[in-house]
Design a protein with these regions (language model features):
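Short polybasic/polar patches that bind polyanions
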Residues: 115, 290, 308
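Residues within the DNA-recognition helix of helix-turn-helix
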Residues: 302-305
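Linker/hinge segments immediately adjacent to helix-turn-helix/homeobox DNA-binding domains
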Residues: 13-17, 35, 40-43, 136-270, ...
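Regulatory input/activation interfaces that engage signals or partners
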Residues: 1-154, 158-165
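Short alpha-helical segments used as structural interaction elements across diverse proteins
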Residues: 298-299, 312
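Basic, Lys/Arg-enriched C-terminal extension of HTH/homeodomain DNA-binding domains
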Residues: 307-332
Length: 332
């Protein structure tokens, strides 16, 4: 998983090479499969299906690739929401359908497109932005099955990094972001701007750089869980750190602003809206904390403030409000 994450942060690769690199390294750790596929998607208009952008595959039958592309094109609005409107999740197709009271045999679109081609089930990691665009890693499975909790968590943690890397690449492509801080291992923060240079930010960024190094020092398979807990894709709900090397050989961590963007209820601060968004997806405080690179206590505090500002008494009200707003949207 660490090798996959490291290649995810390769900003020097163009789009074609980056997607191929993700597919190649995902194939090594894909459950019950010798290959993997990755693709970007746009599920913001469910009635039009799911639009696939860049994609790449490694060691997979061409029939699975073609079936996946066709499946997305023909996805129903209901399946678009089930699979692509859920944040960062990892599951098998059979498990997603089971949780929604159905099965592969009862889902005509999947049964014809994929199961009918000789792939009884498939694994998928989906990393979706609030705008319902994002990145998928998927692979066929030779039997209907569910993933164990440890494997599922490792993939979801990896998804946090791939999601952050993809979001940052898109922002850099639009020239929408610039570095705000630079940390040099052994020296600490050597540059900071836009609030990244104050004492609190300095401590957070230096700690994040040390954690990234400590995670990669735990490279063995038996230490993967510990390493993934240490290394965060987002720091303080704001920055993603990229390792770079200067021409003189100096190693640096460069921090880019990389928080997810979405429509903001005017009452909420940017930090409160992030927590409220993830809570509305049904994410637990501990998982929100991991995704945003903050503590569970900070999540609880920001969520309480957000609920108060929105006039809600419980996080379940936030989930209900989010669902009600989605159902009131035109199906466009």
């Amino acid at each position: 998983f660490l090798s996959l994450i490291e290649h995810g942060y390769r900003l020097d690769l163009d789009e074609r090479d980056w997607f191929q690199s993700i597919a190649d390294h995902a194939a090594v750790v894909a459950p019950a499969s010798d290959g993997a596929m990755t693709y970007s998607f746009d599920a913001s208009s469910p009635k039009d299906g799911v639009l696939v952008g860049h994609w790449a595959a490694a060691s997979l039958p061409q029939s699975f690739v073609e079936s996946t592309l066709m499946l997305n094109q023909n996805t129903t609005p209901e399946d678009a929401a089930r699979f692509y409107h859920r944040g960062i999740v990892c599951d098998t197709v059979s498990e997603v359908l089971r949780k929604n009271g159905t099965s592969i045999d009862q889902n005509d679109t999947y049964r014809r497109a994929v199961a009918g081609e000789g792939f009884p089930d498939s694994f998928g990691l989906t990393a979706s932005n609030p705008s319902h665009t994002g990145l998928v890693v998927n692979a066929p499975i030779d039997s209907v099955r569910k993933l164990g909790p440890g494997l599922k968590r490792a993939w979801q943690q990896t998804g946090v990094h791939l999601h952050a890397a993809y979001r940052l690449r898109e922002a850099l492509r639009r020239r929408a972001v610039k570095p705000e801080a630079v940390v040099e291992p052994g020296r600490g923060l050597v540059h900071g701007e836009n609030g990244a240079g104050n004492e609190s930010a300095r401590q957070v960024l230096e700690s994040a750089a040390r954690a990234a190094d400590a995670a990669r020092a735990r490279g063995g398979p038996e230490q993967a869980s510990e390493a993934l807990e240490l290394w965060r894709g987002l720091i303080d709900g704001r920055w993603t750190m990229i390792e770079t090397f200067e021409s003189d050989g100096r190693r640096l961590f460069v921090a880019y602003p990389n928080d997810p963007e979405f429509e903001n209820p005017r009452a909420l601060t940017p930090r409160e809206r992030l927590v409220a968004h993830y809570a509305a997806q049904g994410d637990a405080n501990k998982w929100i904390a991991y995704q945003l690179g903050i503590t569970p206590a900070t999540v609880a505090r920001r969520l309480a403030v957000a609920l108060g500002k929105l006039g809600l008494s419980h996080r379940h009200d936030l989930i209900w409000l989010s669902a009600a707003l989605r159902s009131a949207e035109p199906s466009s």
